[in-house]
Amino acid sequence: MIRNISDEYVYKKEVDWSLLMEGLTLPVDNQLVFGQIMGRFIHRGETKDITLYLEGKSYSAKIVNVNFDPRFKRKKDTYQIRYSRNGDLAKALQVYFAKSYQFIKAARDNRDPTDRKMIKLPDEYKEYLAIYTTEYDDSYILEPILVDDMQLLRETVKKH
């Protein structure tokens, strides 16, 4: 239970191509937390400007409640955090998550162009991006959890 919303962990996203390029979709469970933090829920088709901080540098982004075509008969809202494709944040994430980026890029370059399946990283390449709230309803802190960090954690756990 969140007692104080400021500086609380909100979500951990496994790195994938979308995250490295333009954004991420928030699971339904996390949408409630984001709505509480913002002080309101955004309606379908609505966006809210936000600031994401990565290693002390600020980046502009948006939280979007996706307005899907009515033909899809979506009952639940879908929140996404979006930023400019190949913009400053995307480029910074590609640098931080260089191992994941290189693995996914090589797999995309070497597959059949008609294959649109999401490329999953093997365990030894898995990296994550943790999202934390701040005292402001439009600002979030991003923390990279790199593959080297994960390997160090596994080794530490094995020793104990």
Task: Give names to the regions the model predicted.
Residues M1-H160:
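Acidic, low-complexity intrinsically disordered regions
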